[in-house]
Design a protein with these regions (language model features):
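TM-loop-TM module centered on a large, flexible mid-protein loop between adjacent transmembrane helices
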Residues: 1, 110-179, 198-233
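Transmembrane alpha-helical segments of multi-pass small-molecule transport proteins
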Residues: 1-25, 40-46, 215-221
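Inter-helical loop and helix-membrane interface segments of multi-pass membrane transporters/permeases
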Residues: 1-11, 56-75
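Hydrophobic, membrane-embedded alpha-helices of multi-pass small-molecule transporters
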Residues: 10-13, 68-128, 132, 161-182
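Membrane-water interface regions at transmembrane-helix termini and the short interhelical loops
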Residues: 12-35, 98-99, 227-236
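Hydrophobic alpha-helical segments and their helix-loop junctions in multi-pass secondary transporters
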Residues: 37-64, 127-133, 251
Length: 254
């Protein structure tokens, strides 16, 4: 399904993110910082409100789902199998390492710290949702809006307006991922061009901002064209790329 309004939104956002990255890594980093603060602020509001207005009895039956220890363990493993994909965006850090204004020895520590903080933050958000909504309310939310976290935020504050706040935070999360992959993808093309793995034209830097302009233009153009393919094609492409990138990582590791 292709909706002109959403295609227009996607094209405009893709253009703006491309432009921001052309203007320099510092400009893109400022955008990333601002949006991350919004995400953190929305999450902290939910966590604090859940502590004040939540009920610990709502967590009963939600912590470990299963009829026995064996089924509980199976359900934990099912979630554990997919959790590595939650951290796929962190691979952008080494790709942009040359432009990070910190000692190289600290980059590894920063990556580990960022992963730990992300685990703590999203674990607290998950607990906050379970602290505010009981199992039946969660099922009702999934069958209705599908925005369980937003519904938890609305209940915690007693107003539907706060649901919009958490939705804005979620949108910021999408944009930060989009922006980070733009940074990482363009730097990957730049490095490959410098190594003559792809045409050298992708190693060209902007005369003023020193950004890989041709690589950014290519990624930006493909990103702006992608929404016209529709959701079905996009899901298929993403699945294929995820599979092939994992296979490539395995080959490189070997």
């Amino acid at each position: 399904d292709i909706y002109p309004s959403w295609v227009a939104v996607a094209v405009i956002v893709a253009f703006l993110i491309t432009l921001i990255n052309v203007l320099g890594a510092k400009t893109a980093a400022v955008l990333q910082t601002v949006l991350t603060c919004i995400i953190g602020g929305a999450g902290i509001l939910l966590i604090v409100a859940s502590v004040i207005n939540g009920d610990s009895s709502n967590l009963q039956g939600q912590m470990f789902v299963g009829e026995s220890t064996g089924t509980m363990f199976q359900n934990i493993i099912k979630v554990a199998v997919v959790t590595p994909f939650f951290f796929i965006g962190f691979d952008v850090i080494p790709q942009a390492a040359e432009e990070i204004n910190v000692p190289l020895k600290k980059i590894g520590k920063m990556m580990i710290l960022s992963v730990v903080l992300a685990v703590v933050f999203y674990s607290c958000v998950s607990l906050a949702v379970g602290y505010v909504l009981n199992p039946s309310e969660i099922l009702s939310s999934e069958a209705g809006t599908g925005l369980v976290t937003a519904d938890a935020m609305a209940k915690a504050f007693g107003t539907a307006v706060m649901a919009k706040v958490i939705i804005v935070g979620g949108m910021c999360g999408i944009i930060t991922s989009w922006n980070s992959f733009m940074i990482g993808g363009s730097r990957a093309l730049y490095s490959m061009a410098e190594s003559y793995m792809i045409p050298p034209m992708f190693a060209k830097l902007h005369p003023q901002h020193k950004t890989p302009i041709n690589a950014l233009f290519l990624i930006g153009a493909l990103t702006m064209l992608a929404p016209f393919a529709g959701r079905g094609m996009m899901v298929w492409i993403c699945d294929c790329l995820l599979y092939t990138s994992d296979a490539a990582d395995d080959r490189i590791s070997v």
